[in-house]
Amino acid sequence: MELKVLNIQGAETGEVVTLNDDIFAVEVSEHAMYLDVKAILANRRQGTHKTKTRAEVRGGGKKPYRQKGTGNARQGSSRSPIMVGGGTIFGPQPRSYEQKVNRKVKQLARRSALSSKAAAGQIVVVEDFSLESIKTRPVADMLKNLGLAEKKTLLMMPHYDNVVSTSGRNIEKLNIQVADQASTYDILNSQAVLFQKAALQKIEETLG
């Protein structure tokens, strides 16, 4: 698949890049993408949820009332799970939600995600650019010129650029990632994937 390279004004530069079929034209594996995205979202969870059992709730050492003669069911503690203010039975406890995905499955998932975007015509290539100072306006103008201002856009960069990353941080629908660090979730959660030209080479080195 060939794509025209655009400049930040949205005009064609006359240059054409060829997408690697081993990355952008593979048979899409929905199961691999499912496994990877599920693991990514699970691994984001803190797992710090906690409720107290009857052993952990403060108080309740004294028997609420005598064993016999009241007509009520016998009770040994006011912190019993059936009492108001009592402990919780089988409540959530701190745990790890970490899920492991094999490296080959992760790579297949990323290739599948990129291939699905390529098939849908949702990949755009722009010439390499940099900013002299931190300003949101140039990045916002570039997205507008490319017709991506209203779309959830993933900008793939060849390397980390603090000026560009900080400039685009305040744009709600823009996600900026270094090409070899963008996850399957980042790709699938976007409506358009915007590659700097050099980022294509970076992704080929990673997934090729």
Curated annotation (Swiss-Prot):
GO biological process, one term: translation
Signal sequence interval, chain numbering: none
One Pfam family it belongs to: Ribosomal_L4
Keywords recorded for this protein, A-Z: Ribonucleoprotein, Ribosomal protein, RNA-binding, rRNA-binding
Domain of life: Bacteria
GO molecular function (one): rRNA binding
Region listing for Disordered, in residue ranges: 46-97
Residue stretches of biased makeup (Polar residues): 69-80
GO cellular component: ribonucleoprotein complex; ribosome
Alphabetical list of InterPro entries matching this protein: Ribosomal_uL4, Ribosomal_uL4-like, Ribosomal_uL4_dom_sf
Function: One of the primary rRNA binding proteins, this protein initially binds near the 5'-end of the 23S rRNA. It is important during the early stages of 50S assembly. It makes multiple contacts with different domains of the 23S rRNA in the assembled 50S subunit and ribosome. Forms part of the polypeptide exit tunnel.
Family stated for the protein in its record: Belongs to the universal ribosomal protein uL4 family.
PANTHER family: 50S RIBOSOMAL PROTEIN L4, LARGE RIBOSOMAL SUBUNIT PROTEIN UL4M
Subunit structure: Part of the 50S ribosomal subunit.
Name the UniProt record assigns to this protein: Large ribosomal subunit protein uL4
Lineage, highest ranks first: Bacteria, Pseudomonadati, Chlorobiota, Chlorobiia, Chlorobiales
